[in-house]
Each structure stands twice: as C-alpha cells, then as structure tokens.
C-alpha cells in the first residue's frame, strides 16, 4: 500500500487560506460526476500528446511528466522512449528520458495510441510541458511526476503562471512532499491519496483532508470488496463535503472494469471523479445518468402531493420510504442504475396508491348496511310482485 499527495495549485491570491485554494471544479459539491481522461484521448491520438489532450472534452486530463538530462519537463509515461517513440523515418529509438537532452527528444515522433510496434508513426512529436500549457490553455491538467522532479516542473508552472490550470500528483511520503512545497513562494493546497485496504488509514486520510479544508481525496485498493467501498466511508466523504476520486486505469481499481458496469458500481459507492481510458464513453454514460436524475426529480415533485390520510397505511409507508430514497438520490451522488431503480420503485408505488384509492371507493360503495339490506329486500319483493302480476294477467 502507498500514500500519495495530489497537489492542487491555484492563483496567488487564493493561497492565503488553504480552504480557498481549490479550483472551481474541485469545489463543485453538486451531484455532478466529473471525468478525468488518462493520458488524454489516447484511443484516437498518441498518449500524452497535445492532440490527445485537445481531443478531450472532459473536466480533467491526467498526463505523465519526465525530466530530460538538461532539466526540461516533457510528457512521457515510461522512463524510456522505447515504447512510444520513433525517428523521422519511423525507425525505433531507445533511451532513458533522463539521459537524453531536450534537443534530442523533441525530434522524436510519437506512435499512435499507446505505442508499441503495432502502432504506426504519427505527425505528433514529444511535447515539452511548457508547450502543452501554452497550447491547451483552459484544460485542467493533472500532472503525474516524481518528487525528485518537483523543482523542474514547478518552475515551468510558475513561469507560465499556470497555477489555476494544474493539479500536481506526486508520489512520495507526505512529510517529504509537504517539506519540499513549503520552501516554495507559492504553497499549493494538497489532496491526500491512499491506496490500500486498512479502514483506519482510509478514515485517517479523509479526516486529514477534511481538517485541512480540502475538497478531494483519492482512494484505491486491489481488493474487490475493499474497505474503500464501505458505507461509512461514503458517508464520511459526503458529510465532509469531500469528492471521492477513483482511477479505473491502474492496479488499484478494485478489479473493476473500465466500462459502464464498473463506473456504475464505483459511483454507487460515493465516488464522483472517475479517471478513465474512455472519456467519450464515460461522458455519454454521465449524460444518460443526468437524464435519469431529471426524470426522477420530476417524479419526486409530482409525488409530493400524496397525503397519508387518503391511502392505506401499509402501502403509504412503503411509498414514503421509496419517496425519501428518491429525494435523496435525485439531489445527491448517484449512479444511473440507482436513479433508474429508484424511479421504477417510486413509480410502481404511486400506481399502487392510485389503485388503492380507487379500490377504497368501490368497497365503500359496496359496503353492507341495514338500510341497504332493507332496500335490497324491497327491490326484490317489487320484482317478485311484478312477475306474479304479469303471470296472473296472462292466465286470464
């Protein structure tokens, strides 16, 4: 297990108080699910390229940063260029990023998608971090890099004035990262990340984020039924107004598939920022989820007119439970499946109430009373008398 710090950097004026440091997206405590595209839209462009970032229509894009031999931060996931790069003739190239100069590495072309021999050369070249910041202005980027590269990365951000655009995700011990950042003129706020399956550590991470006035916490586990999915963990994040971040793209994804089934499951456990390899599909899922939320909210509004005195108690109690659940889900964090199921349940109970009300009226109309018995007897006697009269008249 490991603990990582995600550092969120914002503009100078905001650094006076930690609680005010987070970007507007991070501070958005509405029910909206946010999307983070891992390495950009690498399904349709080279990973960690300017093109891949620009193609993304989502809330965040996470990219990997390495530093060249001459101290220039560039976008690259691996320690080497072997998997993702070729020369101008399409020939394979090799070497560690840390042993190549920027002049050398900037001439390399990127293979399409996630690289490898099966992917062809593209026109995209390895971009520097400075180039990425300049050409993708307006897109919030999560930068994954080593603590040892902090100075090089930080200087680029500082020079570009790109603090509102950037979130740092730094591997390292909490005390080491905090010490390194405390030496900076601008000290960004931080969001704790915990990967593991110890409930005490999960709760401690959330408590630490909450006490620091932070708005996001990232949790991961390799256990399919891990403690990060416990209801009390979800409740703790919600009561602290902290958004849960979950990555579907690494080994700490609790064995969830990066598809609508996995997203639905993770979101149903309270996580509202999802890192994915399929941002377009996740955006579509979220659109469908919001449609389900709107439909449920409209049904909840209509159901507010039902009054307990008008209906059988047993059915109304079931209705009220379903109504309260639907009310909570329509205004809070919920998956598409949760919203759809809540709608179906509430709609069904509304129908039961309507039928029960109709049945009640029919039973009242048919209720046996002394007066109705006398009336029925008199009617029957009248019918019999009429029949006798007509029979005798016919005989004459």
Residue ranges and their predicted role:
Residues 1, 12-15, 322:
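Generic detector of short, well-ordered, non-transmembrane alpha-helical segments enriched
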Residues 1-7, 376:
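Sec-dependent N-terminal signal peptides
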Residues 2, 58, 138, 379-381:
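Generic secretory/membrane-interface signal
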Residues 5, 75, 365-366:
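Short beta-strand element of the conserved SAM-dependent methyltransferase core
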Residues 7-15, 381-388:
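Hydrophobic alpha-helical membrane-insertion segments, chiefly the h-region
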Residues 8-291:
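Phosphate-group recognition and catalysis centered on beta-loop-alpha active-site segments
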Residues 289-379, 383-395:
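Beta-rich interaction/scaffold domains
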């Amino acid at each position: 297990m490991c603990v990582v710090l995600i550092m969120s950097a914002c503009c100078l004026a905001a650094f006076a108080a930690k609680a005010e440091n987070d970007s507007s997206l991070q501070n958005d405590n509405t029910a909206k699910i946010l999307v983070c595209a891992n390495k950009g839209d690498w399904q349709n462009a080279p990973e960690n390229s300017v093109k891949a970032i620009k193609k993304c229509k989502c809330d965040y894009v996470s990219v990997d940063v390495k530093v060249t031999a001459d101290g220039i931060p560039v976008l690259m996931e691996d320690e080497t260029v072997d998997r993702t790069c070729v020369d101008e003739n399409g020939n394979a190239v090799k070497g560690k990023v840390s042993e190549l100069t920027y002049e050398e590495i900037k001439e390399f072309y990127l293979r399409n998608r996630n690289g490898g021999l099966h992917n062809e050369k593209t026109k995209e070249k390895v971009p520097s971090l400075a180039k990425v910041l300049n050409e993708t202005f307006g897109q919030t980027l999560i930068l994954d890099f080593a603590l040892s590269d902090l100075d090089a990365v930080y200087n680029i951000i500082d020079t570009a004035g790109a603090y509102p655009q950037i979130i740092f995700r730094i591997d390292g011990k909490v005390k080491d990262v905090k010490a390194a950042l405390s030496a900076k003129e601008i000290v960004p706020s931080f969001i704790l990340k915990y990967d593991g399956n110890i409930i005490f550590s999960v709760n401690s991470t959330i408590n630490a984020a909450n006490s620091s006035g932070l708005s996001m916490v990232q949790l991961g586990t390799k256990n399919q039924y891990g403690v990060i999915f416990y209801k009390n963990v979800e409740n703790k994040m919600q009561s602290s107004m902290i958004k849960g971040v979950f990555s579907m793209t690494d080994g700490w994804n609790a064995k969830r598939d990066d598809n609508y089934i996995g997203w639905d499951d993770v979101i149903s456990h309270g996580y509202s920022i999802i890192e994915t390899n399929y941002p377009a599909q996740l955006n579509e899922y979220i659109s469908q989820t919001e449609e389900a939320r709107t439909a449920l909210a409209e049904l909840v509004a209509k159901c507010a007119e039902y009054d307990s005195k008008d209906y059988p108690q047993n059915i109304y109690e079931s209705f009220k439970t379903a109504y309260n659940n639907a009310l909570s889900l329509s205004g809070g964090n919920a998956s598409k499946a949760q919203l759809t199921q809540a709608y179906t349940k509430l709609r069904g109970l509304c129908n039961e109430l309507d039928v029960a009300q109709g049945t009640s009226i029919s039973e009242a109309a048919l209720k046996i009373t002394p007066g109705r018995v006398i009336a029925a007897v008199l009617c029957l006697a009248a019918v019999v008398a009429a029949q006798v009269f007509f029979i005798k008249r016919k005989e004459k």
